[in-house]
Swiss-Prot record:
Belongs to the UbiA prenyltransferase family. Protoheme IX farnesyltransferase subfamily. The chain crosses the membrane at residues 28-48, 53-73, 116-136, 153-173, 180-200, 226-246, 248-268, 281-301. It is a multi-pass membrane protein. This is Protoheme IX farnesyltransferase. It is found in: Cell inner membrane. It is an enzyme of class 2 (transferase). Pathway: Porphyrin-containing compound metabolism; heme O biosynthesis; heme O from protoheme: step 1/1. It comes from Paracidovorax citrulli (strain AAC00-1) (Acidovorax citrulli).
Length: 302
């Protein structure tokens, strides 16, 4: 082997790894695992034991694998759509860097490995709920809903709201009202989050042919929906306190964060600009992350 070929071999392996890793949509999956982790922690009274921390780590790994599998399958199905959108044209499937067979095999391998981890080392309920979430996102949302209805985000948001339920089930072996409240919060958060993105990426979505709300119903109608959903979300975010899951620490954080989200949505409704829509979208990510972090702090402080 020549020196040149020897030096390029590691680069080729690294490049191929990066391509497969990109299929898993790492930043999205990180938020999914974080929300699942919050569900795990809240399910355990007091500080978890060493054994429970290990159990959480294994559960997070299994959920990460299946979530990555769903993301990869989404990239496979939407590769031609992704190629027409500036936001997603860089994905390996859209650029033709990975074949359909490679992507499908990678998705299947991750799903199988994650399901096996959850079934063997966590519990059967978590495995089945996680697999159902995979089907909900990869098949029902990606294949059925997204290309057919502007309400795709609303209906399909159920699969994206599942992580706290998965986390809770992984620690308790059942599903109670508490994780369903967390499910409701993410379910209500999803439409204004994605519609804010769709507003300033509307031309991308128009080129893609996807029936996103700004494309089918226009900018003004979508802005109103963002505003209305943030009001409903505000009420939903109070539920952990009302139900007794949290104390005033979480309540104070929820009020501040939801007021901020509503303020962004109101400004967006009154005086639209792409820059403001982008800020609203970014704040929605901060909102959910800090909201769940506040739940975590509240759980340990009081």
């Amino acid at each position: 082997m020549s020196a040149a070929s020897a030096s390029t071999a590691p680069q080729a392996v690294s490049s191929r790894f990066s391509q497969f890793y990109a299929l898993t949509k790492p930043r999205v999956v990180q938020l999914i695992v974080f929300c699942a982790f919050i569900g795990m922690v809240l399910a355990v009274p007091g500080l978890p034991s060493g054994e429970q921390w290990l159990h959480m780590a294994i559960a997070c790994f299994g959920i990460w694998l299946v979530a990555g599998a769903a993301a990869a399958f989404n990239c496979l199905v939407e590769q031609h759509i992704d190629a027409r959108m500036n936001r997603t044209a860089w994905r390996p499937t859209a650029k033709g860097e990975l074949s359909n067979a490679q992507t499908l095999a990678f998705s299947a391998l991750l799903c199988l490995a994650g399901s096996l981890v959850l079934f063997v080392w966590v519990n059967a309920l978590t495995m089945w709920l996680t697999f159902a979430t995979f089907v909900g996102y990869a098949v029902i949302y990606t294949v059925v809903l997204k290309p057919r209805t502007p309400q795709n985000i609303v209906i399909g948001g159920a699969s994206g709201a599942m992580p706290p339920v998965l986390g809770w089930a992984s620690m308790t072996g059942d599903v109670g009202p508490e994780p369903l409240i967390l499910f409701l919060i993410i379910f209500l958060w999803t439409p204004p989050h994605f519609w804010a993105l769709a507003l300033y990426r509307v031309e991308d979505y128009r080129k893609s042919g996807l029936p996103m709300l700004p494309v089918t119903h226009g900018n003004e109608f979508t802005r109103l929906q963002v505003l209305l959903y943030t009001f409903i979300l505000f009420a939903g975010c109070l539920m952990p306190f009302v139900y007794g899951m949290s104390s005033w620490i979480y309540l104070a954080a929820a009020v501040v964060l939801c007021t901020g989200f509503c303020a962004y949505a109101f400004r967006l409704w009154r005086n639209y600009s792409d820059a403001l829509a982008r800020k609203t979208f970014r704040f929605s990510l901060i909102h959910l992350s800090l909201l769940f972090a506040a739940l975590l702090v509240d759980h340990y402080v009081l």
